[in-house]
Amino acid sequence: MRRSQRVRKPTLSNDYVVYLGECDFDIGKVVDPISFDQAIDGPQSSKWVEAMEDEMLSMKHNDVWELVELPNGFKPIGCKWVFKTKKDSKGNIKRFKARLVAKGFTKKEGIDYHDTFSPLSSKDSFRIIMALVAQFDLELHQMDVKTAFLNGNLGEEIYMQQPEGFQMKGKEHMVCKLNKSIYGLKQASRQWCLKYDETVTSLGFIENKIDQCIYLKISGSKFIFLILYVDDVLLASSDLNLLHETKQHLSKTFDMKDLGEASFVLGIEIHTNRSRGTLGLSQNAYIDRVLKRFDIQSCKPGDVPIVKGDVLSKDKCPKNEVERKCMKKVPYASAIGSLMYAQVCTRPDIAFPVNVLGRFLADPGMEHWIAAKKVMRYLQRTKNFMLTYRRVDLLEVIGYSDSDYAGSPDDKKSTSGYVFMLGGGAISWKSVKQTLVASSTMQAEFVACYGAATQAIWLRNFISGLKVIDSISRPVKIFCDNRAAVFFSKNNKTSSGSKHIDIKYLSVRDMVRKGDIIIEHINTEAMIADPLTKGVRHVVFKCHAESMGILSSFDVLG
């Protein structure tokens, strides 16, 4: 059957892929113009015109295109101006940014583009590097690559219409033949990453094989890490001269903006106290904006994000059209998405309630909305808390794995939770409902160990590539509070209660046998992953949150 060559129209008029720094965490009221006409007719027109002129200068500086007559057989793609106000950690506007974006969704795979994959650094990698900054008292600086995607070379022959408002006088009929990649093209991100990799490896940096956005350079007893997140570059170095030397080399190839010491990255505030040997990651300003958006800032602060005994189920979903219509007015999905970003970045203490609330996105009820507001009231009390790392005598990765039993009232499935610690703070965590119905607490705990074990292997492989944590050569220790699960992980014996366990979970035994991990028993009172699987008493929750490194700013900074 012949494949259709018809190009599907986008669902929305501005269905473009755009990488702007605040897109992940800026949840304030949308005031940015959505069209060229809105920008030039609005109260900030002079700012937006200046921003567009800066963008056009970047296009000229990078030799992104040349004006030509459109060849026969080619159809030019359109382009659109995208406007964004960049904000600081307090939400104040610091820059007006205009980005020229190609309508890449109209291009055909295999004709106009081929490979599109580009790596993206994980939050786990970022937190591990932050723990190392605290441990080794590293210099931590930040740089921004201006118009990063324009640095990528383009192999395909692509023509684009001239930008709105900037058509060349007397040559309005001509089109732009693209020499470089441009925002909006399917291959733009990949081409930028390839160019960046080519540049930094020529400077002697080695790419981490597990997270391809992390680079290491060792020069004698000195070392430096580079962390790339789209167009943001973090530099963590044991030597200030090596750091400045690297900055100079990068600035020779790319148009860079030196932001000095890192203090605000991807909506995360970085606070250091070098005399105390501590580093804290905070989302205070972000949480403030979340609370204001959902009108929670004046509510009574809560002690815990979910109370022990709280049950959230499908029984609390709307029962009729009247209730369903009422819930359509509630911004439930937006609230859960906002909480999810805080949870993923710096707040493992809300991982369990956010995971549970996310199960009802399709049809939430009023009880679910009340539970979501309870999480926000807890954040109201703890918004100035930080995920903290500190200098320790023995730097090693320690894991904790836990599970409840049949905690989901709808399908009787259990919830797994794990947290890995390094330098006194959590570097990796997860709370997730299991995909099977466990027949015993041992099986539920062993399945949870499987999730923790696979993450331990990832952490071990990644950290091995950093070459600064000697203890990673030893098996990663994972604590479990179920003796039967610990025994089962170390023995090949089966019983009537374990013979039906899926073979993939039995790979835990192989990891133990090969010396990649070791699973040891710990008392339930010391299981800090407990709040990732169920609601617990306030005193217990507070103790475990502190053990995960969730501390007040006063405790971190003094």
Question: What residue ranges belong to the model's regions?
Answer:
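Chromodomain-type histone methyl-lysine reader module
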Residues: 1-198, 202-209, 214, 556
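Mobile genetic element proteins and their domesticated derivatives, centered on retroelements
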Residues: 6, 36, 52-55, 59, ...
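Catalytic palm subdomain of template-directed nucleic-acid polymerases
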Residues: 86-87, 150-162, 186-187, 217-254, ...
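RNase H-like nuclease fold core
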Residues: 99, 103-105, 339, 400-441
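C-terminal reverse transcriptase regions that engage the nucleic-acid substrate
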Residues: 124, 130, 182, 187, ...
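Catalytic palm active-site di-aspartate
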Residues: 144-147, 177-185, 207-237, 250, ...
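Active-site palm subdomain of RNA-directed nucleic acid polymerases
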Residues: 195-230, 234, 243, 253-262, ...
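RNase H-like nuclease module associated with reverse transcription
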Residues: 264, 269, 396, 426, ...
